[in-house]
Amino acid sequence: MTTLALNLAQYNDPITKGIIAQESLRRVRPDLKAVVNVNPYAIPTSAALVLEKLGIGTHPMSLAVHPHAPCKAIENQILNTVGHLLPKEQPVTFMAMKKSKLNMLRRHPSRADTFINPIYHPRDNVRYGLDPDPDQDASITASFLEVKTSTAFMQDTLHYLTPEDLLDIFETSPKLENLIASFVLPVEATRNMKSLYPDLYSIHYTHGGFQWAPSGHLGDAYFHEPWQLYWLRCGSLTRLIEEETTTTVQPPPGFEGEAYTRVRKEVRELKIYAERVTSIGAHHLFIFSRNAKATPRVRSYSQNGKWVTLPRIFRPVSHNVQTPLKQEVANSLMLYTYAVRPSLKDVAAKVRQKFDEKDLAEHSPLEITHLINYIYYIDQRAYLTNDDDILSDNLLKRWIFTPIQAAYKKAKGFLLGPDDFQKLLKALEWQPVTFDYAVDHYKSNPWRIHASRTGAKMRQLKNFLSRTTGLCEAVEDDALEGSELLKELEGNMWFRNPSEVEKEVFDAIVADLPPDSQRSELILEDPNSNARDYLPIQQDQPSVTQGPDEAAQTQTPTATSMVTNSVAARMPPPVPRTLREHHEQFPTTVRASFEQPSSTRAPETSENNTPAESVTPSPRAIYVGDFAIMDANASTSRASSPSPRRTVVSPRQPEAQNETLGRQIVSRVSPAHGCQMSPYAAQLAHQLSEQTAYTDVIGQRMVAFYSQHSRSYKYGRHEHRSQSWLPVIDSLQVALGLDESYDHCLIQRYRKHARVGLHADDEECYEPDSTIVTLNLYGNADFLIERNTDKASETITLQHNDMLFMPSGMQVTHRHAVCSLYEGRVSITFRNKTKDYLRKSAPDMNPVEQPGASAGQLTGPLDHRPEELPWEHWIPRLNRLGFTGLQKQTDPEGKLIYPITEIRQDMVYVPFPNCCPGPLRKDLEAMGRRPVRYTVDTGRALTLASDIKNNRVGALLQNADLTWKTLLVEYCRMEPTSVPMTVIHGAGGSGKSKLLQDHLNRAELNVVIIVPTRVLQQDWRNKMTEFPSFLVQTYEAAMMESAPQMVVFDDYGKLPHGYIDLFCQFHPSVEYVILTGDARQSTYYEYNSDAGIRNLPTNIEVFKQYCGYYINCTHRNKQDLANMLGVYSEKMGSTHFTFGNTCETGSLLLVPSGTQKTVMGEAGHKTETYAGCQGITADKVQIMIDHDTHKSADSHMYTALSRATEHIHFYNSIAGLNTARFHAKLNLTPYLKTFIQVITERAAAETEPAEYTVQAPTARTHIPVENCSTFLEKDLEEQRAKEDREVYTQAGATNVFQTNSPIVQCFQHQQPKDGALSIITHAKRLQYASAEANQAEYRAKLQIGAALWENFKTAMEIPDEPVPFIRDLWEQSEAEVLSTYLSKSEMAIKNGKNRQDPDWQDERMFVYLKAQWVTKASKFNLPTAKAGQTISAFKQAVVMKFGAMARYLRRITPKPDNIRINCEMQPQDISKWALGLDSHNRPTKQKWNFERPAFASDFEAFDQSQDGAMLHFEALWARHFNVPSSLIEEYLFLKMHAQAPKGYLTIMRLTGEGPTFDANTACSIAYNHTRYEIPKSCMQLYAGDDMLLDQVPVEKTGFKNIAAGLKLTAKTEIFEQKRGKWGEFCSWWMTPYGLVKDPITLYHRILLASEIGDLSKKIDAYAIEAEPAYALQGRLFDCFNEEQMTAHYGTIRRLIIEGKTNFSLDDQAPRHQDLQGILNCMDAKFMYH
């Protein structure tokens, strides 16, 4: 261990170790990246160790597998080395290499590199993805000829070539200076050895050659011939080349004579030197150079250890060890024989021990046998030398005896042979095996030429003449094979100069042409070009003295007019403009060819009266003229357009007509006239080509179709389904000046020679006057146009980036066809005026007809650009975002809205880091979003880290390990890091994230997206279906995980302050950061007042200085809504605004506070706060307006109002919307005030209340015998004395435990005359407050009341729309209340005359104690007296008025099937509902679930706890059903001004006020559904404050936020729903056989009534309550336990004793065997009912 490593090991602190580990990881990460680039595979350990020795690392965490991963890693390393050798700025020719491997060479595909990939083996078709070139010779070297770059690279193909092939390449490629070549040849094959690297590859010798199998996989093996091993020792290649030069010698001045031609032949030497660059295993990299001077004389290769060959000491020679042996093995075996005198078997065992299992397979049995014999042989020799030692020398011995002895030994050895020791020495003369070779210098036959080159040249020449002159037929690949011409030319070609052979081939082809078509001369423009560059020259050139008319009659163009002007081609392209501007800038004569009949056009000539020469631009725009007005017989100047390359003469047309055909059809304009496709448009077109997903294959072309209004495009038998419209298409249309009417975009990719026959593009989906625009993106193509009238035709050769415009009317007059001349040619075709577009698009989207525009002109939005736009120079960037930027829009105050704002000119940009992919880099740079250098603010980072460590912020981070948190803080104290950062600010829907999503969704990038909320996280995942979802992380999870090199922070303003600084400081792996956000929207807010980040500036404030500009545009909101917000929008239409007092379900609800979000969310609404909805887009949005709305910041309101795309519904949860105070509050919120002014109230849908049919129940009885004499014995023993149980007050003691009967004293008797009890009751039941305090409480609890109403509405399935008021139902409710009052006795009515006094104020009331015996089971035999119940006596008219309102709401409110309210119902009705019986007691499906515990809830002081929240809930309930507002206001006034004799009462429920029972029940439902998660499958029973559910609900997590605002205190109880433990509801038990009365409570009442003498008055009621249990007979034992059965027996016995003979157990009583029979009996007439 080194000193430094030893010192670092002394740090044992985990935090310090973590810091050291992070620093080490930071330093080693670039190395790991380089390792993965070369070797991304999972390599076996043994192979990984070998690769590491060879200089190739292996990533320990790699999981990628490959059949021969080690050799693949070596191949990548070779390519990596080649990448360092290739010139960076110059083009390179790549031979036999796939384009996908350019990334290993670190070369961008956009460079002008050339690929030559010959098809030699069949699998090359799959490897290169190309079909064989028809012009390619069968010989592999024929495709390598004519390399036009100075440097070339040939991958793993050199071993297939001979030295002559390589010389051919250099001879035919004079520009080629250096050829870098890699090949795979194992050097050990030169000695027939096994693999030197068996973990990397194996070698199998077979059929006179050998197979090289990477990783031992013969399925991937390559077969090599022995002669290919020559390349391992190739040093130079030499060839003598004979060149013939011809010079014309003129006679000297003054001498007569003729000039003569001198032919001189010279011989030059072509010498190529070869040098090895590197060798890794069997992979070698060589460089061949023509300008070198020498190469090393000896070349050595690695031998992976020391090897030796054993001497051949046995006869015959074949009986010796033939293959080399590792020297360490040989030495080991030799020393073994020295140490032990082994037997032959011992030697064999030792040999077996020295070879591994896998090595044994490499040796034949003969080899092993020979080795064993050799080792045994040396073992039998003498080990001790018999030579004299020099230490014993003396003078005599040295000079006399030693020479004599030496001569004797030599003679003896010569005659008798050597002794054993000499034999041993001979046997041990091992020869070391090395791979050192003297390089070989190859010399070639000087006149050799391949026959295949001759055949290829002949085909190239004939095919060229076929294309350029049409005077000979094209030749197929094998058409010339075996022809007589070829045989004649190949005669004696091995001894002839190659140039003479090629010339003879060319002359022979010309001789075969028709006599009248031969040219007198053919020249080659470039001596280094191939046969395609031969151009025909017309012998009869027009004279310079010809006039315009004569020049116009020239039929054949000159060579000069057909050669590209190199100077013009180098001119920079002009600024792109609209197509109309291009058209207007044409030269007058050129425009005349489009706009005037041919008879009126004037010819154009140059100054010397010669036809003006035209130049073919690249790229260029080709306009097809208006054919409908052409005069085929007109004769006009040829100068109006350049002549085409070829004119096809129709046999039916006169020659004169054919002369002007090309001029009339096609006009080309030079770049000087500005009519070319702009570089920006070309870039967009290429980007569109890269994004295109081809869906259909037709013949030899692939097709993709895009449209916004058409589902498909059909022609003939083919149909293409439309794909989603890409944003880049919009940008390309804008760049080309095309309007939105160009709705069809057809993209096609052609194979070479693919054809589309003559057609007119007149499908039914197009209008007859539609226009066609075609971009020829890649490659060349022949475009044929044929006139319908006379079948005259013309062919245009479309070149790279050409544009073709076919005007309206061409579908009627002409047809066209296309033939691809290039493999992979791509065309993009736009068509306008589709019928689907005209039918579906808005009128303002149609193309604008401009005055004076001809039929063929293209017009659109760009033709109506407003003048003097302040943002004129920003329009290209707006176009990339999908905006035209040509409209002037104003905000509500009339101010001009700028689409680009907050422009900064002081930005200092830095280069993009390498981790940013090229396409994304280009788009960001084009949008002006280049990165800036940002240095982390460690102070901000440390503040957030401290808050995280001390659990002041975050939820997930609070559970992190303390060590990790401490490490987080320590990182913030280190030196700050700096990262390149791109900040993108824009309005919601501006597309600031769309660019990133488009790139990330189609590329595998090392990037993570960090978002502030889960809602935004899901939004990203939904939009990027191809992107791994786990890479979209919330900010807390991202902080705890490792980070990639590139990080995107979306909506970064909602991240905690300092988060970005902390993230970059804690993750040093981050190399590039992209921030997207909106400076106008809400930002992060920390609720913890102790958090340090509360005092930090927001992220927006910190990073907005690094944003170049703000995109104040939106695609989300329609123009009216966007303009109200001060945002630019081109989305037409009107946003729908509505207003109401109810919250609708199904759409996003935005609320002002987090409490409201929790409450409304638990009520079933999809809810977000104003500030928390950032990043969400929805068609419809609801915005809640309450008393917290005006407290919201403008940024919060802006965020909320900008979410909707179609509809905003304002939900008012405040009473008195139209009050002046409310409007004053709205003035505090300017955004909302703008919207409220444009809203009208909606009408509610009408609903009819449901009607209920009430059936009268009856009962029968039955009971077995039980003993109940001691039933109350235990209770009576525990009973205290009366004096100890009464309560004493200033008015004396209470008197609730009366008489001396112990049974009676178990029950409290509460009476109004008990003054002491009245004092206790009033103190507990009544609370006093002022009217102002009640109003303040009501306002403070509006939110809670709204939450109660929303949950009640959800539970009762009340429609969202307000229900109209039903007058008839109201009057019926009033009549029922009046009838109930009048049904009282005259005495009762007379006693209430004071309450009927009209002068009695409505809010005044009397309060007195309710008289009752307390028989409730929970209050049986209490140790002390408890407070009683109060009765509030309001004015009778008030009670009847609000009683009618309560009855109306009860009738009109829907009642879902899972909820039953015990009002106007009998126990049998509830039993039928719970057990699923129909009206005829037939079982259907049981609803109540008895397989799980039941749940009951009661309340402590329920009436007194119904405060302002419950009152607001009642008001919302009444308002939703359109109860007259005056009545609602009166009810609110009464509740807040209720006045008892001692003063105003607080807001509470008062028994006797009218709606007591209905309001209590509704408040109970609302409270329980607000507090608990109660599913629809849960059956529920309610009656006042009593409630029973058939399952135990789960409390909502958000209830704790509003629990403190409620006075209600619930008492819950869980029932197991087993024997004796059934759910209790209003003293009834829910059993599997229906409701039965609690037998103990019923028996207590009977005992009390019997003791006080009231049993005879109440016996009928008790009998009815006992009947359901009595009817169960034997099933009663399934319901009651022992104690309960005793109580039931006592009840039945007492009823029988009191004369209820129907309860006797006679045999005539019905025996019910099933549930249906039980209830049928219960429904029968009962005599006591």
Swiss-Prot record:
Skewed-composition ranges (Low complexity): 635-652
Positions of the (+)RNA virus helicase C-terminal domain: 1112-1247
Signal peptide location: none
A molecular function (GO) term: metal ion binding
Record key words, sorted: ATP-binding, Dioxygenase, Helicase, Hydrolase, Iron, Metal-binding, Nucleotide-binding, Nucleotidyltransferase, Oxidoreductase, RNA-directed RNA polymerase, Transferase, Viral RNA replication
Annotated (+)RNA virus helicase ATP-binding domain residues: 957-1111
Record's protein name: RNA-directed RNA polymerase
